[in-house]
Structures are given as C-alpha cells and as structure tokens.
C-alpha cells in the first residue's frame, strides 16, 4: 500500500483532514478513510514559534471541527480508532507493529492538537462534550436534506440556519464513558508497551497527551477538585505503575532516536528482522551531552535535556504535575512516589508502591539537578521518601549531588528566586543528617574553577558549602531581601556548625566577616532610628521608621543566629578549628559594640572567653619569643586547644533545625510547576489564553 506523506505546510489543505472536520459522519470502521488520514509524517514543534506556525495552519480546520463535531461525532470515531490500535499493539510482534505504532502516534497527535485547541479557546465542558459526542442522525439528516434542496450559492447560509434550529430542539448525543476509557488506554500505552526505538515517540506523545489534558487547569478558573479531567486522571486505578514508568523514563534518560519510528529521511518504512531487533533500546546513557550542558549552566542544560531526552523531560514534568495537585485529598500518585523503594533492597517495613534502581535515579539527578524541575523532584524524594533519603545519605560521592546545587546558588543572578529557594531547602534537608554534616568535611576538592572570588587549591566539600551559603546570605541582603531565604541559609549552617572541622582559613574569615557585615548594617540602621525625626534623611523615601524598625528586628535575629553558629562550633569542635580561633583573635573588635546588647551578651560571653583564653597564651609566648608569624600563632592555638575544656562555656541547646513545609504549599508549587511546563516543556501553550496561573516567573 502506498504511503501519503503530509508535511506541516499542507495540513490545512489535506483532503482527509477536511473530511474529518466536515459535516459528514465517518464511522470508526471505515478503514479506507482512517488509513488515508493517519498515513502522514509531521515534524513536531520544537519551540513556541513552531507551535504558533502549526496552530495558524490548523486554525481553520479546528474551527470547522468545533462547528461540526457535536453533530458528526467524528472525534469520538477517531478516539475509538486510537483505542483499537492501542489494544492491537499489545498482541502484535515488533515487525507487525511498526505501521501500527506510526498510525497510533498520528491519531494521538491529532487528538492532542484538538484537545489543546479546545482547552485554549473553550471550556472543560466543551472538551468533554466533544470527547463523548456521538453522530446525531436527526441533525445530519436535516443538513443533508437542506443541502439537496438549496441552490449551491446559498447552501451554506441555509444549512447553518437549519442546523441551529434543529440543534435548539435536539440535544447533543453523548457516549458518557469514552473519556475515562481514553485515559485508561493512555496509561496502558505508557506502562505496558515496551519502550523501543520505534515506539519512543509514541510514548512521548502519550505523556504529552496527559500533560495537555491536565493543562485545562491553565485555562479554567475552577478548582481542580471540581474538574472532571482531574478527577478522572486522579482516580486512575494504575497510579503505582504509571508513576513507576514515568520515574523509570527519568532515571534511564534515553536519548531520542534520530528518526521517528525507524523511518528513513524519505518518509518510507523499511523494517527487516535484523533492524527490528537492533531497534530495541539497551537504555544506555549519553552523559557527554548533559555534562557539556552542565558546564555551560542551568539554562543550557535545560535546553539540551529537552532536545535530546524529551521523554525523560516530559515524564519529569508530568510527575511534578501529578504530585503537586490535589494534595488536600488522597493523591495516589503522590503516595506512590513517596513510598517507592530501591530495587536492590528488600524493604521489611512500610508499604512499597513500586521498586526502582535508586542508584540510577540518584545518578540522573546528580547530572541534571541544576535545572528547576530536577531540583523539585529531588526535593520531593528527600523530603517525603525516607528510603530514598537514607539511600542518599549512604552515598560516598555526595559531592556529585551537592556541587551542582552549590553552583546554582553561586550563579544566583542567573537563577530564578524559586530555584534558589528550592536549592537551599534541599541543602537544609541534607543538613538534618549528622552523618552528612560529618562527611562533607572529609571529602576534599581540588581546583574549584567555577568559584572565582578567590583561588583555592584545595578545600573540603563542607568548606565550599559554607562559603556558598554565606555568599547567598549576602546576595539576599543586597538584592532579594527575603526573610525566609535568610532563615533557610542560617538553619543549614546551624545544623552543620556542631560538626565544622578543618575549616579553610578563607572559610573562617568569611564566617566572621558575615557577622562583621551584618554588625555594620545594624549599627547604621540603629543610628538612623535614633536620629530626630525632623533631621533624619531616608535614602529610600518609601522606607518608613516602622519598616526600619522591622528590618532592625530581623537583622538582630540574623546576628543572633550567626553568633550561635560560631558558639556551636567553638563548643563542639574548637580543637579541630584552629583557623576559626585565629580569625576570632584577629577580628575580636567586631564584637565590642554588642557585648552589652541584651540580645547578644550571653552568647558573646562564650566567644569572649575563648578569645581571652587564647589571647593570654599568645601574650605569654610573645613575651618569650617576640613577634609571632601566622604558623607560630596557629601552633600556639593548637597546643592551647589540647588543654581547653568546653565545660567553661555557658551551655546552649544544640542547634537542630528541621524543614517544615508551610501551610498551603500548593500556592507556591502549582504555579511554579506550570511555569516550568510552559517554559521547559515540549508542549507549547498559548500564553494569551492562560487564566489561572501566571507564567511570568523568571525561569
């Protein structure tokens, strides 16, 4: 049989599409028509401009479809054809299924294009009407009779008038079960049909179809618990296997085949037995592509991930949609993700939704964690899946995960505030584990080329982590002024402080300099508030004394926390942190203005006691030897540390902070997730039609 190849350019004039959207009913068993309609090749839109071009070519066809389908039920016939072909795929051999896969993909692509159009221009009610509409014999007969009786030049106007009057008297005939059956078929396609080279795009299209259906949230202003689409998807009986399949697609990051369905560039299909066998995926990874993107930055990596690994990218986005919506009710997808287990383990406690190779998930996340959607998935797994959290804490190469997160924070001006926030929360969650806080100081790194503030030939992972968090605090003070960002930064440092070890001299300097910077700001702000109202000059006219008082209060909380972090290190790890003691001796004057301040005096007493102890020892040695060099001072500190007892210090509670999700987290996560879908996904939606979610978050 010959194959008719339709290109994007001639979609609008395609006779098969014109018949499909026309006024005549086409039965689902009209094989000649469906073979003609579904034998086409199309270049998928790669960006929003491609999608805009495709949409403009389909506009007239879509309008005809909207006007006629509720009478013809042709959309329902197409859905039935898709359901039949999906069912048949399960029983066909590879060689037999090549043409079937191609036609199934084409059917699904047409369905998705129409669903997208209805979502963007209509309502969910209209979408479901078109899904369920069956041929209306009365309306079709009225149209046919009118067409036969009316001269050609006025046939169209008369036909529309007849249809409108008939439609007023005759309700739309609907099936009632087709939409739910369609959702089940999509899930079956994703989880049952194996991913091979010639099925890759079919799986991708099925995932994109689910995302497109759920995008009804973007274009409607009703809550998702009232949405039939959401209720149908979220009551799916196969949540575990769907979540398992999607996470496997992410973990395996299989590169997109060079050709769709194994076709040649000429558009014909040539499949021999050997070629069919060779088309089966071995799920090998292509790390060089992503590593090159990782080196270039998060934006470049996002582009490479979407272009070269679209199935993994879209599966990741769909996971985020499914797990962040409907959190107030029982969400089977969310429960499934949070209760999965390592396939190399035999969990004895707790329910297990499915098993997956955690090492593959971990390795993939390490590779792509600098992109927003990967950071979000990592957050969900660490925060809510205890098994995965324990697995990560046991890894010997934690730098593979932590360093990319630190790079995201280091490149804060190029990252969006949401990504910075989530990256910090991930660090905070990691810092809740004492083993992590100890291990980061035993992992040594050399030549950190991306850290350009200062050349550091060797530093511990813990040391560079402290430097980046301090830098983030200072960046936030200047640019973002986000109290919650400060809180998360300081909480992570506080959790780690009792385990600081072998701090690099520069790290010790930055810790004390952080207090010094904050102290200067406090002094300046306090002085401004104490000036007479008539002589006070405010640089920012929008800043009131009340605002400044609030800023001062926040600043005092931050200063207090920094002092407690220093105190925690001195109390627990003084003998292992001579460089910090050295810096405190050198910078002792920065604490002078706060010794009598009620908010700081108790903790500063401890710091003063340490400084006094080592200062007196240095003075005695200097009296004997004269002026001491840096190494000699450190030698005195090390000897003194062996005789120091922390019992002299006032006891404070251990600094232990745990991340707690705020109330109504969906208010943060749902807009964020859909912003990522719109910006980094393979499905491009009309931004002009979006109502319920703003997509102007800078990603």
From Swiss-Prot:
Positions of post-translational Phosphoserine modification: 346
Q: Which superkingdom, per the lineage? A: Eukaryota
Among the Pfam families in the record, one is: Dymeclin
Instruction: Please provide, in alphabetical order, the Gene Ontology terms of the cellular component aspect for this entry.
Output: Golgi apparatus
Q: Name one GO biological process term.
A: Golgi organization
N-myristoyl glycine lipid attachment residues: 2
The UniProt keyword set, sorted, is: Lipoprotein, Myristate, Phosphoprotein
InterPro entries for this protein: Dymeclin
Q: Which family does it belong to?
A: Belongs to the dymeclin family.
The protein depicted here goes by the name: Dymeclin
Native species: Drosophila melanogaster (Fruit fly)
């Amino acid at each position: 049989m010959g194959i008719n190849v339709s290109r994007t350019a001639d979609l609008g004039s395609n006779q098969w599409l014109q018949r499909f959207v026309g006024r005549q009913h086409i039965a689902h068993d009209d094989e000649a028509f469906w073979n003609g309609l579904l034998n086409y090749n199309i270049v998928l839109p790669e960006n929003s401009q491609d999608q805009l071009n495709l949409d403009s070519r389909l506009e007239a066809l879509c309008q005809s479809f909207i006007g006629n389908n509720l009478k013809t039920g042709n959309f329902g016939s197409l859905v039935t054809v898709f359901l039949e072909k999906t069912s048949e795929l399960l029983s066909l051999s590879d060689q037999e299924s090549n043409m079937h896969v191609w036609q199934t993909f084409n059917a699904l692509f047409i369905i998705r294009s129409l669903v997208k159009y209805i979502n963007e221009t209509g309502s969910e009610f209209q979408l479901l009407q078109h899904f369920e509409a069956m041929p209306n014999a009365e309306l079709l007969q009225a149209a046919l009779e009118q067409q036969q009786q009316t001269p050609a030049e006025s046939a169209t106007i008369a036909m529309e008038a007849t249809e409108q009057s008939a439609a007023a008297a005759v309700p739309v005939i609907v099936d009632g079960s087709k939409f739910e059956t369609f959702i089940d078929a999509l899930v079956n396609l994703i989880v049952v049909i194996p991913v091979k080279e010639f099925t890759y795009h079919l799986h991708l299209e099925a995932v994109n179809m689910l995302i497109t259906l759920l995008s009804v949230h973007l274009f409607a202003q009703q809550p998702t618990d009232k949405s039939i689409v959401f209720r149908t998807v979220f009551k799916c009986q196969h949540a575990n296997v769907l979540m398992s399949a999607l996470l496997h697609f992410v973990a395996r990051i299989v590169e997109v085949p060079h050709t769709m369905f194994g076709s040649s560039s000429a558009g014909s299909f040539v499949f021999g037995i050997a070629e069919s066998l060779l088309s089966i995926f071995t799920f090998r990874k292509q790390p060089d592509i992503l590593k090159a993107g990782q080196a270039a930055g998060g934006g470049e990596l996002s582009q490479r991930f979407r272009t070269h690994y679209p199935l993994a990218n879209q599966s990741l986005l769909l996971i985020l949609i499914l797990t962040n919506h409907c959190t107030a009710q029982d969400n089977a997808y969310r429960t499934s993700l949070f209760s999965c287990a390592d396939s190399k383990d035999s969990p004895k406690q707790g329910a297990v939704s499915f098993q997956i190779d955690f090492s593959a998930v971990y390795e993939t996340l390490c590779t792509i964690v600098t992109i927003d959607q990967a950071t979000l998935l990592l957050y969900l797994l660490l925060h809510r899946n205890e098994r995965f959290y324990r697995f990560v804490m046991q890894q010997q190469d934690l730098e593979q995960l932590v360093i990319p997160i630190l790079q995201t924070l280091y490149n804060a001006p190029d990252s969006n505030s949401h990504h910075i926030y989530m990256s910090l929360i991930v660090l905070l969650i990691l810092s809740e584990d004492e083993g992590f806080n100890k291990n980061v100081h035993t992992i040594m790194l050399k030549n950190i080329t991306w850290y350009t503030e200062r050349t550091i030939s060797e530093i511990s992972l813990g040391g560079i982590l402290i430097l980046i968090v301090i830098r983030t605090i200072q960046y936030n003070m200047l640019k973002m002024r986000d109290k919650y960002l400060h809180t998360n930064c300081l909480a992570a440092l506080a959790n780690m402080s009792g385990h600081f070890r072998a701090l690099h001299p520069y790290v010790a300097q930055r810790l004390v300099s952080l207090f010094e910077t904050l102290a200067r700001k406090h002094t300046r702000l306090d002085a401004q508030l104490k000036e007479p109202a008539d002589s006070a000059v405010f640089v920012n006219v929008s800043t009131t004394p009340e605002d400044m008082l609030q800023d001062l209060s926040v600043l005092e909380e931050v200063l207090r926390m920094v002092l407690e972090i220093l105190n925690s290190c001195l109390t627990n790890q003084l003998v292992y942190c001579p460089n910090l003691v050295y810096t405190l001796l050198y910078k002792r004057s920065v604490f002078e203005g706060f010794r009598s301040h009620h908010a700081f005096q108790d903790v500063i007493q401890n710091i003063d006691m340490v400084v006094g102890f080592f200062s007196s020892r240095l003075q005695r040695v200097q009296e004997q030897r004269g002026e001491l060099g840096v190494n000699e001072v450190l030698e005195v500190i090390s000897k003194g540390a062996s005789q120091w007892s922390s019992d002299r210090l006032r006891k404070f509670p251990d600094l232990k902070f745990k991340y707690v999700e705020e109330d109504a987290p969906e208010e943060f996560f749902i807009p964020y997730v859909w912003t990522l879908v719109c910006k980094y996904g393979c499905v491009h939606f009309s931004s002009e039609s979006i109502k319920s979610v703003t997509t102007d978050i800078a990603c």
